[in-house]
């Protein structure tokens, strides 16, 4: 199985998707039924994708909730691996 050594924060994928749809952050937040600050935190890498947000993204932007959660999981695992020596 191929894995990325340094996957991007999934918020960057969300941001790209929003831009491809030619939406503003405010408009996308309304479509997702979340606050603008919540979406802003996600796309700026300050928050992750929860299962609830994954469902919202799949219904609004596309793909599946599992896709969005896998992006988050891969990112989180890569971040932990960077600190593996300090963990053990």
Q: What do these predicted regions represent?
A:
Residues 1-23, 70:
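A short, Lys/Arg-rich alpha-helix, primarily the initiator
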Residues 2-6, 30, 81-82:
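Short linear interaction segments
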Residues 10, 64-65:
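Hydrophobic side chains within well-formed alpha-helices
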Residues 19, 30, 59:
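Short polybasic/polar patches that bind polyanions
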Residues 23-41:
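Short alpha-helical DNA-recognition segment
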Residues 35, 46, 61, 72-75:
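The DNA-recognition helices of helix-turn-helix-type DNA-binding domains
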Residues 46-59:
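Short, basic-rich loop-to-helix N-cap that marks the start of a DNA-contacting helix
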Residues 66-88:
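Short, charged recognition helix plus adjacent turn
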